[in-house]
Curated annotation (Swiss-Prot):
CXXCXGXG motif repeat extents: 151-158, 168-175, 190-197, 204-211
Record SUPFAM superfamilies: Chaperone J-domain (SSF46565), DnaJ/Hsp40 cysteine-rich domain (SSF57938), HSP40/DnaJ peptide-binding domain (SSF49493)
Cofactor binding description: Binds 2 Zn(2+) ions per monomer.
Name of protein: Chaperone protein DnaJ
Homology family: Belongs to the DnaJ family.
Keyword Zinc-finger set for record: yes
Biological classification of the source: Bacteria, Pseudomonadati, Pseudomonadota, Betaproteobacteria, Burkholderiales
Single GO BP term: DNA replication
Length: 378
């Protein structure tokens, strides 16, 4: 039988918010929960269907894949609608009902009807600060990150060498215990074995029964040219180890770009403030500016005013998703001279006098501004 559209299952629009999706799921789960419909196969199927839809649409990456490719874009085994029974109910509803039952929603492994389940390890995040030049050109580097690895003494079992884990007497190897409150009855992680289905009578002294030890490892990281602030680089399999033999999580290296002394980045474009002498602004000339690839020069026309912006095409950054480099925008600031000599003062006074004799043609903006002020007070 073909699967129904996940949005149709929850009864929400395709542009529904996360909160709307959660509310719709909660309503359906309360309506079709097996403990409220113990003899209804139809209710059981509706509950599984709603649970699968919620797990897909509440995850940003899975939802994006589903929106683009439909059911073919997501792994149906990740939905939890297969042979897990209802062992995943507490997982899916932990954030909604955790406060009702006094439990914290988390990633701890929960067992199912078929015994302890395997769980993928948690992802880790590493924050890396790089320069604008490194972001623009890319480079290879190494990072040292703390990591959990399998204990070499007990080979990950957590048990003292010569002994082995035993079946948990509390959950009888299931990894979960059932908890009831009012008309709700849900499965919780077993408090004795923490979801593994086994307990360790004689823990390994090296790892204290955890089966893993912490160590620092060195990883090679390739920073691609054009990366921007806030982007992440995925290092597959370098996260936390899995639970009950599950696959490890991933490490995400989050990039932060240091402020630059000259440039400000805006996407693929760069901006810089360039002071120029007032003589160059008045007479025009050639000025030289720095770029990430070296130096570049461009002509400044005579009569350039402070704040004028010049665009140098292709002198920005070629972003990760761009086929061409961005532009460099040079914002010129006309610099007023200071600490003048007497001779320089006299020359400027003569210059000022000549400007006054020339009238508005030398200072059109000033003339226009004074005219507006005059009309304002009339």
């Amino acid at each position: 039988m073909a699967k129904r559209d996940y949005y149709e299952v929850l009864g929400v629009a395709k542009n529904a918010s996360d909160d709307e999706i959660k509310k719709a799921y909660r309503k359906l789960a309360m309506k079709y929960h097996p403990d409220r419909n113990p003899d209804s196969k139809d209710a059981e199927e509706h509950f599984k269907e709603a649970k699968e839809a919620y797990e897909m649409l509440s995850d940003g990456q899975k939802r994006a894949a589903y929106d683009q490719y439909g059911h073919a874009g997501v792994d149906p085994n990740m939905g939890g609608a297969g042979g897990q029974g209802f062992g995943g109910f507490a997982d899916a509803f932990g954030d909604i009902f955790g406060d009702i039952f006094g439990q914290a929603a988390g990633g701890a492994a929960r067992g199912g009807r078929g015994g302890p389940q395997v769980y993928r390890g948690a992802d880790l995040r590493y924050s890396m600060e790089i320069t604008l030049e490194q972001a623009a050109h890319g480079y290879d580097t190494q990072i040292r990150v703390p990591s959990w690895v399998s204990c070499e003494v007990c080979h990950g079992s957590g048990a003292k060498p010569g002994t082995k884990p035993e079946t948990c007497p509390t959950c009888h190897g299931q990894g979960t215990v059932r908890m009831s409150q009012g008309f709700f009855s849900i499965q919780q992680t077993c408090p004795k074995c923490h979801g593994t289905g086994t307990y360790i009578p004689e823990p390994c002294v090296h790892c204290h029964g955890s089966g893993k030890v912490k160590e620092t490892k060195t990883l090679e990281v390739k920073i691609p040219a054009g990366i921007d602030d806030g982007m992440r680089i995925r290092s597959a399999g370098n996260g936390e180890p899995g639970i009950n033999g599950g696959p490890p999580g991933d490490l995400y290296v989050e990039i932060h770009i240091k402020p630059h002394s000259v440039f400000e980045r805006d996407g693929d474009d760069l901006h810089c403030q360039m002071p120029i002498p007032f003589t160059t602004a008045a007479l025009g000339g050639e000025i030289e500016v720095p770029t990430l690839a070296g130096r570049a020069s461009f002509p400044v026309p005579e009569g350039t005013q402070s704040g004028k912006t010049f665009r140098l095409r292709g002198k920005g950054i070629k972003g990760l998703r761009s086929s061409i480099a961005g532009d460099l925008y040079v914002h010129v600031q006309v610099e007023t001279p200071v600490k003048l000599t007497d001779q320089q003062r006299d020359l400027l006074k003569q210059f000022e006098k000549s400007l006054a004799e020339g009238g508005a043609r030398h200072s059109p903006q000033s003339k226009s501004w004074f005219d507006r002020v005059k009309s304002f007070f009339e």
